[in-house]
């Protein structure tokens, strides 16, 4: 019984330590607040009034969750999980850019991530996230189409909390 308890404790500590190491090696992990005054878009209404971006280490990748208030006052809340392997996974919620229903992310280098969204199998957008050297700012530049098929471009700036 004592051996089983020691074994279970070692396994639990190993899992916690590996999760902490992954979080430390991924500067994207954390909670980020949108800075609307430093953000811009090609058309009115694409930048949120306020927003929180939470990236949580999960396995070899991360879970991304977004919550905020759109320019028109409506609620935005969506999430997706990625293994940073470029494979698409389901996105759920409301307000996903371009109305994407699947999303994929690849890690280009330690501080750069490229994501692509598809709706019904058709590409609707791509974005690049770059984390600053000090790890305090994430700048996301995106290009795509809105739900009416019009081209869009955005740059959003997020501060780490």
Spell out what each predicted region is.
Residues 1-6:
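Positively charged n-region of N-terminal signal peptides that target proteins for export
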Residues 8-19:
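Bacterial N-terminal signal peptides
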Residues 22-161:
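Hydrophobic small-molecule pocket/channel-lining residues, especially in calycin-type beta-barrels
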Residues 7-8, 32:
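Short helix-onset patch at the extreme N-terminus, typifying the N->h transition
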